[in-house]
């Protein structure tokens, strides 16, 4: 509502529209900064943490996948796949990107 009053006063006082356009540009810049820090920056941090997790994986680590599978890494291939041992008789190949988190040692034995 105050925007209309400012416009009415500007017309009466004969001021130019340049001050109004500066405030519009200022609000757009503030909006873009808020958008960046609320959406893009957290996603970049999350991607960086996930990349560090993937690079730190070694044979014998116990992990959980995006689909909820718990297993021990048996083999890591050079082309980005992991042989995951779910139990003594079941092994699956999965893409490294599907690893969500690293579990503490001995988690699989306690289940």
From Swiss-Prot:
Protein's gene: yajC
One Pfam family recorded for the sequence: YajC
Entry GO terms, CC: plasma membrane
Protein's name in the database: Sec translocon accessory complex subunit YajC
Homology family: Belongs to the YajC family.
Domain of life from the UniProt record: Bacteria
A single GO BP: protein transport
Topology of this chain in the membrane: Single-pass membrane protein
InterPro entries: Preprotein_translocase_YajC
Keywords on record: Cell inner membrane, Cell membrane, Membrane, Protein transport, Translocation, Transmembrane, Transmembrane helix, Transport
Principal location class: membrane
Transmembrane portions of the chain: 20-40
Subcellular location: Cell inner membrane
Role summary: The SecYEG-SecDF-YajC-YidC holo-translocon (HTL) protein secretase/insertase is a supercomplex required for protein secretion, insertion of proteins into membranes, and assembly of membrane protein complexes. While the SecYEG complex is essential for assembly of a number of proteins and complexes, the SecDF-YajC-YidC subcomplex facilitates these functions.
Record's keyword annotation contains Transport: yes
Quaternary structure (record): Part of the SecDF-YidC-YajC translocase complex. The SecDF-YidC-YajC translocase forms a supercomplex with SecYEG, called the holo-translocon (HTL).
